[in-house]
Amino acid sequence: MKMTKKKRTKVFLTLLVILIVLLAGIILTNSFGGRQETIQETMRDAVLHETGKISFLGIKDVNPAFLSAVTVTVVLLIAAALIRIFAVPKFTYIPGKFQMLLEQVVGLFDGLAKSNSPHRNGFLGAYVFAAGVYIFCGTLFELFGFQAVTTAGESIALPAPLSDINGAIALGCLSYCIILSGGIAGNGVRGIGKTLKDFSLPISMSFRLFGALLSGLLVTELVYYYIHLSFVLPVVVGVLFTLLHALIQTYVLTMLTALFYGEVSEPVRKKENAERQKKAA
């Protein structure tokens, strides 16, 4: 009984401390004076990036997402080089935890490429792996809350690279170029025609990425503005949206790229023979 009372007392005191901290946070995070951006201004800037520019190496003022893209790219390249130099030579027939994890990730994207493009998948597997890792890590990047100083002297949290429409369009167009190269490699000039037939593909890919990431940002901003508990619920909402978008958008873009690549790179003769066999059956 004594232990039970002690436990109850500890639980009660813990809850009381948490409640006091939350109340203090609510009071301290409320604005007293000074101008704050309205929700309309915040959401407009999230889409158009008219304000909040960052000086990039003193050369040019850029959107925060560009700096995020450069940071994520450099980190991934350094990580890839370190893994190749120090980890890969130590791989064994009986894999350790890190080797097993790496093999599972590589095998996932390699299997995706082979299942959707069985006739031509060497380069496709490498591309969907690189694109998938970039989308996943880039989406999770905003969770770290790295700060940068704008040209106006204000502090701003770096967003996900693909939350900028320019980054999303660049990745969508790059994926379309990869699909086009597969069509040329598989069917020559005829492959170009098959690929250009889906001219809206890069637009749909780009806006799918941008729209998904932007929706998470806007929902989080709405929660910040209209729910006063601005340091508890937005964290949960932001993490959930970010994790879901990282997984979903990685899968969607890599799947679409592999699917269309396999379609345009499939040799025409094999496709015609397969259709004849189906009709004969």
List PLM regions with ranges.
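Selective transmembrane helix interface/packing segments
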Residues: 2-281
